[in-house]
Amino acid sequence: MIPPSSPREDGVDGLPKEAVGAEQPPSPASTSSQESKLQKLKRSLSFKTKSLRSKSADNFFQRTNSEDMKLQAHMVAEISPSSSPLPAPGSLTSTPARAGLHPGGKAHAFQEYIFKKPTFCDVCNHMIVGTNAKHGLRCKACKMSIHHKCTDGLAPQRCMGKLPKGFRRYYSSPLLIHEQFGCIKEVMPIACGNKVDPVYETLRFGTSLAQRTKKGSSGSGSDSPHRTSTSDLVEVPEEANGPGGGYDLRKRSNSVFTYPENGTDDFRDPAKNINHQGSLSKDPLQMNTYVALYKFVPQENEDLEMRPGDIITLLEDSNEDWWKGKIQDRIGFFPANFVQRLQQNEKIFRCVRTFIGCKEQGQITLKENQICVSSEEEQDGFIRVLSGKKKGLIPLDVLENI
């Protein structure tokens, strides 16, 4: 027997059609409109994140992304409170690519790189070398270079990113980025651990020593020869009254421009100095005697003609270049560098033939008819002579006593 039909038909699983209709999700048009709004919001946020690269902007957009996720979750919960065909909020949206690859903008983006120039690892300070090529890892943003084996020992460090071009010219990793490149030192040792380069150490020590010496010499102005000679000149007027005072005055004035040879002064006893000065003052004419080394032809009426070997008595030496002297009864001016002073017990010699000496043996070269003086005795056939600025040994057989 067929049961009677009822105006109320059961739906699926014995539920009424009204209940099934009430549980249906909203229309696809409303869902698509909500998705389009979310996509537009995501595009605007991603565009702003790419345009602004500062740290504050990154933090701002990360906070905005988290608020966006909460807003999306709230909107989806309002759309489907019980069940929804849309995926969960976690799978619906993902963090931006920048935040996914570099969480917080601090991670390095290492890539395989072949180093053409000698490069050192920023972790172990050793050179990146290989059998065939110099393979290693290099950060795409901050250009940090490391070995493959040093990736495990790499401490979590903040990537500074790409620097502006204006700042990149004066970029110095050891001085500006202490957190990332703290292991690099100003003088990087070449595969020698923490040892300092000996060449650098030597140069640094030499520079400091030179600066210290310069400061010390500039500070001790009272030790200069000019100051000492000036104090000596103060006593000159009192000593010029006695005999030989004029010579002593000239002697002291000339000592202003006299410097010790080889850094040594003539240290004598005071008694010896007094005796020496007394002997000089007794015979001032002897100390004012010079011998002509070269021939001088007068250029003016007041000039004094000289021939090699002439004995000249000095009358005035106020001018550095031209002196006034006397030869027998002739008086005139002559070049100061054409004469040689005669000391006591010095003899005058003339070279009879040209002699070429050996500098290694202390000999000098003299031309024919050149004048020289000497006060020493012969030793093994040689005698030490003085001719102008030259001083050395000459064979006695090439000299003639005049």
Curated annotation (Swiss-Prot):
Cellular component annotations (GO), alphabetically ordered: cytoplasmic side of plasma membrane; cytosol; T-tubule
Main location: cytoplasm
Stored Gene3D superfamilies: 3.30.60.20, SH3 Domains
Domain SH3 intervals: 285-344, 347-402
Classification via InterPro entries: C1-like_sf, PE/DAG-bd, SH3-like_dom_sf, SH3_domain, STAC1/2/3, STAC1_SH3
PROSITE patterns membership: SH3 (PS50002), ZF_DAG_PE_1 (PS00479), ZF_DAG_PE_2 (PS50081)
Residue segments, region Disordered: 1-47, 211-247
Location of this chain's protein in the cell: Cytoplasm, Cytosol; Cell membrane; Cell membrane, Sarcolemma
Membrane-topology annotation of the record: Peripheral membrane protein
Record keywords, A-Z: Cell membrane, Cytoplasm, Membrane, Metal-binding, Repeat, SH3 domain, Zinc, Zinc-finger
GO MF, any single term: zinc ion binding
Domain of life, per lineage: Eukaryota
Zinc finger boundaries on the chain: Phorbol-ester/DAG-type: 107-159
Biological process according to GO: cellular response to heat; positive regulation of cation channel activity; positive regulation of protein localization to plasma membrane; positive regulation of voltage-gated calcium channel activity; signal transduction; skeletal muscle contraction
Free-text function comment from the UniProt entry: Promotes expression of the ion channel CACNA1H at the cell membrane, and thereby contributes to the regulation of channel activity. Plays a minor and redundant role in promoting the expression of calcium channel CACNA1S at the cell membrane, and thereby contributes to increased channel activity. Slows down the inactivation rate of the calcium channel CACNA1C.
Assembly and oligomerization: Interacts (via SH3 domains) with CACNA1S. Interacts with CACNA1H. Interacts with CACNA1C.
Name the UniProt record assigns to this protein: SH3 and cysteine-rich domain-containing protein
Lineage: Eukaryota, Metazoa, Chordata, Craniata, Vertebrata
Gene designation: STAC
